[in-house]
A protein has these predicted regions:
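Terminal-region recognition feature
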Residues: 1-149, 153-156, 160-172
Length: 172
């Protein structure tokens, strides 16, 4: 909501959607993937709108890409089980279409009260790192920009990317 957006702005940070909109070519078309993921889920934990992550397919300098941005307004960008599923879908789209993928990282890591539900099978969190390696072997460019918090499991994405950028004063 608005108070959480204002809190991000007070820290000198953009929201996930603002970051993506700033990055993508303004005059080109883009589409958000899974905007309603997480709708009505995890209400006992305060909810997880959009799965806590924003995914868009759009163009950067005329090149079609997948952009994934943690939403720090949702539990400080922590990963819920649906967050992992949405990230996996973004990677799947990138692999199927051989599109570069850009991760805008601002995450407190796994949401600890639900960590037992994030790692249990091959279609969960650990699969993301397998996909990183697979995309690397396929020659699919992966770029990470650390925009804010980058701890625990969330720190592996930048390490496994082809390039990692750390934003001065807001990244940690």
């Amino acid at each position: 909501g608005k108070p959480k957006i204002e809190k991000e702005h007070a820290k000198g940070k953009m929201t996930a959607r603002e970051r993506i909109d700033y990055l993508l070519d303004s005059k080109s078309k883009s589409i958000e993937v899974g905007a309603f993921a997480g709708d009505g889920m995890y209400t006992e934990h305060g909810g997880c709108p959009s799965g806590g992550v924003v995914v868009k397919i759009g163009y950067i300098k005329g090149k079609q890409c997948v952009v994934v941005a943690n939403d720090a307004t949702v539990k400080a960008g922590a990963w819920f089980p649906i967050t992992a599923k949405k990230n996996l879908r973004a990677q799947e789209i990138a692999m199927e279409n051989k599109l570069p993928i850009i991760y805008l990282v601002d995450s407190a890591g796994v949401y600890l009260p639900m960590q037992d539900e994030i790692f249990p099978d091959k279609e969960h969190f650990g699969r993301i790192f397998r996909n990183n390696a697979q995309m690397s072997s396929m020659g699919i460019t992966q770029i990470s920009a650390i925009m804010g918090s980058c701890v625990a499991g969330g720190a592996y994405l930048p390490v496994m990317s082809d390039e990692a950028i750390i934003v001065d004063k807001t990244a940690s």
